[in-house]
Amino acid sequence: MSNILRRGRLEAAPDEEILRYASSMETDRWIFSADIAVDLAHTVMLKEQGIISAEDCSKILAGLLKIREEGMEKLDFSYEDIHISLESRLIDMVGEDVGGRMHSGRSRNDEVATCIRLTLREELLGLLEEIFALRKTLVSLAEKHTETLMPGFTHLQHAQPTTLAHHLCAHEAALGRDFDRVQDAFSRVNLCPLGAAAFASTGFNLNRKRTQELLGFEGLLENSMDAVSSRDFLIECASVFSNLMINLSRMAEELVIWSSSEFNFIELDDTYASTSSIMPQKKNPDTAELMRGKTGVAVGALMSLLTICKGLPLSYNRDLQEATPNIWRSVETVRASVRVMEGMVRTMKIHPEVLSAQSVTGFTTATELADTFVREAGIPFRTAHQIVGMLAREGEKPTIEKIDSVAEIVLGESLSSRGLTEKMIKEALNPVSNIKRRKIEGGPAPEEMQHYIGRQQTELELNEQEIATIKDSIDSAFEALLEVVDEYRKV
């Protein structure tokens, strides 16, 4: 059978190399189900608008359901994309006089834009669920470790004591913003371009609101030229994915470092480790290392999308075909990474005794000692900073005598003469006292962390409800679509 797309305008068929070069069929596997759904909704609307007969509608719907049942492998991969291949298969089944009417009032331009949005919408919903699961795991783990001391770091140097709960919740907070960004992107993805046709809409009396409703979209992309030519939603999602992967990469880096012999803060479960082909004692954190590497997939996809979309005149250009594979690669990598990270965190073995012992290494209580000088001796913080810095340089344990000696050099008087006592110094140098004192909002004090964790658990419950509401809305729309398809098919 001749190519239903080329036979009118073009005489020569493309050779095999051009077919391979121009074809998107392999990538279009991502949108097979979406394309069937779009065809079903469009056909229903055509019938309701009186553009096709009830009998033709019935045959087209039956054919589409059969194609869905057969799967994509039954399609002809010699076509340049899934849309023409699917339509060709339909025409083979029901004849051109019937199947050839399905594309009335429609272009591949609005069709593919709708398919991409439908598929990406599902991927974003799945990603929201996966980020939610990771955040929930982090919060649950933090709840068990509000009093587990550990060193906090700046520049990867021991800085101040904190708790494991405080550290875990820092990652959860970043992931919470990632969750919000995915939600925001979802709101702009969940818009329907169908009915825009090539770019100038159509003279057929289409009901765009009806197909929007049947496909469960929140609203329309109203301007028909914008509807088919915009891929800013892909760029936005790729940016969100890149940000998320960078946050995951930071977590992965910490897991690599923390599981090393030098740190020994944690041990990864064997599931997430590998060994050496020559060194039998090795337990390598390969999964976490791969996650660092796979961050490049997401960042690279963003760069590709920006480069492809730059400088394209309105409206549709074939360059956009090269944009779509990047988003599928990115979202596939990101979703897998979130799932894997959740598993690594949930199953890792924590060494609280090592964390606690390391919490005071490197004079981590120095800041609290300086703060104590300010509070108890009434000196300026910058002066206290100088005194403690000199003590740190000498490397000796701060005692009241040593502190007074340095203070005499800096101030010309002792701090004990200004009310500082040995008891105050001991309390300042105690990491537990350090943590308990830091009870302002967002601090690591156990009491404050318990309040924070409670607030995060409430937020997670709300997030779970939000996801369920969106899914229910989309599921209801597709149930309604299938019900009307079943009704019209029986005519």
Curated annotation (Swiss-Prot):
Q: Which Gene3D superfamilies match?
A: Fumarase/aspartase (C-terminal domain), Fumarase/aspartase (Central domain), Fumarase/aspartase (N-terminal domain)
According to UniProt, the reaction catalysed is: 2-(N(omega)-L-arginino)succinate = fumarate + L-arginine
The GO cellular component terms are: cytosol
Q: Where in the cell is it found?
A: Cytoplasm
List the keywords (alphabetical). Amino-acid biosynthesis, Arginine biosynthesis, Cytoplasm, Lyase
Indicate whether Lyase appears among the record's keywords.
Answer: yes
Q: Where mainly located?
A: cytoplasm
Query: So what family is this one in?
Result: Belongs to the lyase 1 family. Argininosuccinate lyase subfamily.
Annotated PANTHER family: ARGININOSUCCINATE LYASE
Please give the name of this protein.
Argininosuccinate lyase
User: What species was this sequence derived from?
Assistant: Methanosarcina acetivorans (strain ATCC 35395 / DSM 2834 / JCM 12185 / C2A)
